[in-house]
UniProtKB/Swiss-Prot annotation:
Catalytic activity, EC: 2.1.1.-
PANTHER family on file: PUTATIVE (AFU_ORTHOLOGUE AFUA_4G14240)-RELATED (PTHR43712:SF18), PUTATIVE (AFU_ORTHOLOGUE AFUA_4G14580)-RELATED (PTHR43712)
Keyword annotations: Methyltransferase, S-adenosyl-L-methionine, Transferase
Key word Methyltransferase present: yes
Presence of the UniProt keyword DNA-binding in the record: no
Protein name: O-methyltransferase bfoE
Protein function: Cytochrome P450 monooxygenase; part of the gene cluster that mediates the biosynthesis of bifonsecin B, a dimeric gamma-naphthopyrone. The first step in the biosynthesis of bifonsecin B is the production of gamma-naphthopyrone precursor YWA1 by the non-reducing polyketide synthase albA, via condensation of one acetyl-CoA starter unit with 6 malonyl-CoA units.
Sample GO molecular function, one term: O-methyltransferase activity
GO BP term, example: methylation
Catalytic-site annotation from UniProt: H285 (proton acceptor)
Top EC class, one word: transferase
Amino acid sequence: MTAAQNAPIPEAGKKVMSTVTLAPALGFVPVAVHFDLFGCLQEIGKPATAQDVCNIHRTRYGDTNLSVSLANDTLFLMGGLGFLDLLPDDVYQANDVTRYLVDTPSAQHGAMHFTSEGLLASAFLMRRLMDTNFEYPFQECDTPFQYAYKLMGNDSLAREHVYSVMHHTGRLDSFNTFMTGKFGRWGTMPDRVRKLGYDLDGLMQSTAPEKLRIVDIGGGRGELLLEMQAAYPHLLQKENLVLQEYNADIGVVPKVTEMAWNYKEDASEQPVKGALLYSMAHVLHNLSDIESIKLLAKVARVMAPTSRLLIQEFTKNAASSTTHAAMILMHAGRERTRAEWRDLAAFAGLEITFEAYPPNGECLVEMRKVLN
């Protein structure tokens, strides 16, 4: 039975329509970020037209390819997304979200990532499934993201990992900036784990100085290690802090020891043995279960009985469902539940010795080596 043609759209229909029509508007987010429209609008500090925003933009950046018509449509759509306020007669005004985006540059780069690489992958999901007779789950470097490049005729990028593609397309520095602050965090890493009930202070203070070594695997620009050093300056020096990041655009990170380790290579074992802490923050959700087990097993093989592996990821629930989708489409990864973490640990020769799963934000999972 179909709904009457003249009946008003029910609330459920409005919800469906407003959600599924977001994608085209989200496609304009990279335009807003590229031309710094949020910063220009905030600088004006009062209701403004697209022409006003373009004038500020030219004052800041000189002559660019930003036209008034492109700025007007982009500002309008950003207003529709709630990123700024829409006023009558194509007039726009900064709001709290605008100010947040300007004050949190990493959030703008994150918005660009999910509406560039993420939106591209989502557009090719159904095509990838149909063309492979709905083969699922995806495997690393064989996701809708790579399939998009294959169908666009770029066979070289179609075989590359997302990070490699971003490097080749000049997008990796932007992504690295996103990872430094993401969409905002509560406090530092020590603050966050304390709030979840983890006794980091007791662990640090009860460990002999010669055994204090922290290894951050996939640690980006070293933010976590630097936060640890700031929390325990009397205990942690450069030689205690090891950053392992396989990323061509990271550069030199002061105050930590940088060490190359490409864990993707089958013959490449974890070079640091017996560290007190091995950390993986937002690393495993980029990996499939098989690849996650491989990485966990490599760490397990070098762990001492006193070693801990600390994992920080989003708690898998309704609040993280959208990032779960992004990990699937771009990386063949996923967010994980308590049961899924236990399964991964068991397959890798580890056991969970602490876990906390807040309803919002990052979960914390501590794993230790299973002793025979």
